Amino acid sequence: MNVLVACEESQEVCKAFRAKGHNAFSCDLLDCSVGHLEWHIIGDALKILSPELRQDNTRSIWFVTSDGTFHSLPRWDLIIAHPPCTYLTITGNRWFNVDKYGERAIERIKERELAAEFFMQFVYADCDKIAIENPIGYISTYYRKPDCIVNPYQFGDPHKKATCLWLKNLPPLQPTNIVEPEVVYYKNGKSDSPWHMNTMHLPKEERSRLRSKTFPGIAKAMADQCGGEA
């Protein structure tokens, strides 16, 4: 299958599909952090979602990967998208209180609407099979409830990170290896996952990049259950 993994610089999902023999490409505004330049597209994923009319009256999706290679495909058979969640996740809800945060909250509300509209571009993409990932948050109200919610600890990685999946013509992701999640406790009694806590001291951009990365177990399950052997 021709697979587009949109909004992914880590290439975790892309690599999993490549391992199954699929023609998968990651796409992000950032360079890939792994190094498979031949599989990575730098740019706006929305610009390569659908085939465009060429001068010879044929339709195709064309792009250049980071290694400088030109590609032309008839269409995507599967799109897996990871739209930015900064303004969509439930963990940021407190910042939308206009009475408390005023203009700052108003600006965040505008950004949230733009983020939701970006998310919906993948929902309406011209592709037979689609999976869109985001944390628990605004999309469940703006669009609809997800088809399934999974955690890394259900796929062999001992971490909690509730991940929602909205699916089109794909089965809900089934757990493959349930393990005990690692948990740390703060003095106030609240708990957290070590992977999340360990990123708090990092610069904003680096923290966001690491927190958005798909864990290997979920990536492999996506490739196995949504793609299978090519």
What are these regions, as identified by a protein language model?
Residues M1-A230:
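Conserved active-site and SAM-binding loop architecture
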